[in-house]
Amino acid sequence: MIKLNNIPNILTISRLLCCPLWLLLFYFDLYIFCLILIVYSGVTDFLDGFLARKYDATSIIGKALDPIADKIFTSTVLITFIVDSRANFIVVSAIIIRELMVSGLREALSNYNKSYLLEVTFLAKIKTASQFLAIFILALVPLNISFSNTIYSFGTIFLYVTAILTVYTGYKYVIISIKELKNIES
């Protein structure tokens, strides 16, 4: 029987399993199922954190795995969007590099101070919402909707907004991390 406090981690792990499924669906041009997978990923990303907090089921594994699952799935989707020209290589590279950099900073800071957690800023949450919208909208493009060009334009705008917020919040995280490392070393 599944314990209630395991559900958040199960949801997180299911997002990791979505990556190979996404690639398979994408390869076979099953775009409606790709869209469903994006919605599933967004819903489970919200639910795992919500349930973990509500039922006091947060765990070290969950705190570590949740952002990794998000980054891997998001990166997988964005890279496939480059492959079929729905996304710009430089924009996607900026997003992925920032995510890796912030993850590295979090890891470095936690090595110095096990209790330190690089807090997610409000602007970073806006970035995440913009990124989800960009991905969702861009996933609509190949569904042969009569206004695909308009959808593509909106998705691209959200992706560029995401990239700008990504670079800015990444910069802010670097500044915060440098200050924290100086405090730890002194």
Description of each model-found segment:
Residues 87-89, 116-119, 133-137:
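Short, structured loop/turn "capping" segments at alpha-beta junctions
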Residues 54-107:
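Multi-pass membrane catalytic core of lipid/isoprenoid biosynthesis enzymes
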Residues 75, 102, 123, 129-133, ...:
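A general structural signal for well-ordered alpha-helical segments in protein cores
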Residues 16, 36-39, 68, 93-96, ...:
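Residue-level signature of the transmembrane alpha-helical core
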Residues 1-47, 128-145, 149, 156, ...:
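Topogenic membrane-insertion module of multi-pass membrane proteins
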Residues 1-12, 50-68, 110-129, 179-186:
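Interhelical loop and helix-boundary elements at the membrane-water interface
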Residues 33-36, 61, 65, 119-122, ...:
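Alpha-helical membrane-protein architecture signal
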Residues 86-88, 149-153:
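Membrane-water interface of transmembrane alpha-helices in multipass transporters/channels
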